[in-house]
C-alpha cells in the first residue's frame, strides 16, 4: 500500500462543492476523484481533502490524499488521473507520503484568495470567477481595517449560521489587499490555521462595506467582541473565493 499526497486545481462553478453530498444528481469534486482513483485501483478508494470548499468555490492548490493498494510512481498516478478526470479538475503534483499523512488533519495553515471585480457592470468573462461589487470603495479604509483581523480571535460573528464546529476561535496570520486598477479588480489574501464555514466570504463582505463607508473603519473590532453573525450582514459570493495553498509542517 502507498499513501499519495496530490495537489489539484479545479473550477468550482459546476460543482456542488468538494465534499460528497450523498444526494442523487449532485456533482462534487470528491466524487469525481473517487471515481477515477477507484477505477485505477480496481477497488473503492477513500479520498480525503484538506478543505471542504463550498459550491462555486475554486481551488489553485487543494490537497487530497488516498491510500492506493499498490505502489506506482508519481508520474503514473498523475498521468492516469489527468487522462480520466473531467477538464475542470487538474492534478498538478503527486508525492509519496508516510501512511499516517492526512490531507486535512496534517495541515497547519491554509491560504485563500478572494477576487473582487469593481467594474460598473458584470464582466461576462469574470462572472463565475470573481465577486462583483460596483459601489464606490475607499481602499485606504480597507487597508486600515485589515490588521484588525490578525491574531487569535473568536470569529463567531464571521461564521455562517448553523456552524457546528467545536470552537469558533481561529488564528488569522495574514490579511492583505492588492489593487489592480487596470483590471478593475481587488485581490484579498488570507492565511490562517483554519477557517470557519463562510468565514472568508463574510470577512470580505464586512471589508467591502468598510470601504464603501457603510461601516466604521474599525468595526471588525466591535464584531469580534459582540459575537453576533447578524451584525456582519453581507456574505460575498462564492465565485470569488479560491483555496490557494495548503501548508504542512514537514513539507513546507
From Swiss-Prot:
<comment type="function">
    <text>Formation of pseudouridine at positions 38, 39 and 40 in the anticodon stem and loop of transfer RNAs.</text>
</comment>
<keyword id="KW-0413">Isomerase</keyword>
<comment type="similarity">
    <text>Belongs to the tRNA pseudouridine synthase TruA family.</text>
</comment>
<dbReference type="GO" id="GO:0003723">
    <property type="term" value="F:RNA binding"/>
</dbReference>
<dbReference type="Pfam" id="PF01416">
    <property type="entry name" value="PseudoU_synth_1"/>
</dbReference>
<dbReference type="GO" id="GO:0031119">
    <property type="term" value="P:tRNA pseudouridine synthesis"/>
</dbReference>
<keyword id="KW-0819">tRNA processing</keyword>
<feature type="binding site">
    <location>
        <position position="112"/>
    </location>
    <ligand>
        <name>substrate</name>
    </ligand>
</feature>
<dbReference type="GO" id="GO:0160147">
    <property type="term" value="F:tRNA pseudouridine(38-40) synthase activity"/>
</dbReference>
<dbReference type="InterPro" id="IPR020103">
    <property type="entry name" value="PsdUridine_synth_cat_dom_sf"/>
</dbReference>
<comment type="subunit">
    <text>Homodimer.</text>
</comment>
<feature type="active site" description="Nucleophile">
    <location>
        <position position="54"/>
    </location>
</feature>
<dbReference type="InterPro" id="IPR020095">
    <property type="entry name" value="PsdUridine_synth_TruA_C"/>
</dbReference>
<dbReference type="InterPro" id="IPR020094">
    <property type="entry name" value="TruA/RsuA/RluB/E/F_N"/>
</dbReference>
<dbReference type="InterPro" id="IPR020097">
    <property type="entry name" value="PsdUridine_synth_TruA_a/b_dom"/>
</dbReference>
<protein>
    <recommendedName>
        <fullName>tRNA pseudouridine synthase A</fullName>
        <ecNumber>5.4.99.12</ecNumber>
    </recommendedName>
</protein>
<dbReference type="InterPro" id="IPR001406">
    <property type="entry name" value="PsdUridine_synth_TruA"/>
</dbReference>
Amino acid at each position: 500500500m502507498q499513501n499519495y499526497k496530490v495537489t489539484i486545481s479545479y473550477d468550482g462553478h459546476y460543482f456542488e462543492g468538494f465534499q460528497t453530498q450523498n444526494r442523487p444528481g449532485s456533482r462534487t469534486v470528491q466524487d469525481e476523484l473517487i471515481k477515477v482513483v477507484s477505477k485505477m485501483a480496481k477497488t473503492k478508494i477513500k479520498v480525503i481533502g484538506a478543505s471542504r470548499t463550498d459550491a462555486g468555490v475554486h481551488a489553485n492548490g487543494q490537497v487530497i490524499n488516498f491510500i492506493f493498494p499498490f505502489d506506482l510512481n508519481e508520474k503514473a498516478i498523475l498521468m492516469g488521473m489527468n487522462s480520466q478526470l473531467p477538464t475542470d479538475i487538474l492534478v498538478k503534483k503527486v508525492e509519496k507520503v508516510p501512511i499516517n499523512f492526512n490531507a486535512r488533519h496534517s495541515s497547519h495553515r491554509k491560504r485563500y484568495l478572494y477576487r473582487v471585480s469593481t467594474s460598473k457592470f458584470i464582466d461576462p468573462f469574470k462572472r463565475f470567477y470573481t465577486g462583483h461589487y460596483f459601489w464606490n470603495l475607499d481602499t485606504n479604509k480597507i487597508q486600515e481595517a485589515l490588521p484588525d483581523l490578525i491574531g487569535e480571535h473568536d470569529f463567531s460573528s464571521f461564521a455562517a449560521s448553523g456552524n457546528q464546529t467545536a470552537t469558533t476561535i481561529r488564528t488569522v496570520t495574514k490579511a492583505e489587499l492588492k489593487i489592480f486598477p487596470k483590471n478593475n479588480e481587488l485581490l484579498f489574501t488570507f492565511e490562517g490555521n483554519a477557517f470557519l464555514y463562510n468565514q472568508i466570504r463574510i470577512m470580505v463582505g464586512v471589508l467591502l462595506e468598510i470601504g464603501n463607508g457603510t461601516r466604521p473603519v474599525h468595526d471588525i473590532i466591535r464584531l469580534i467582541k459582540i459575537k453576533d453573525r447578524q451584525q456582519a450582514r453581507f456574505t460575498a459570493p462564492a465565485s470569488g473565493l479560491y483555496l490557494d495553498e495548503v501548508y504542512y509542517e514537514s513539507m513546507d
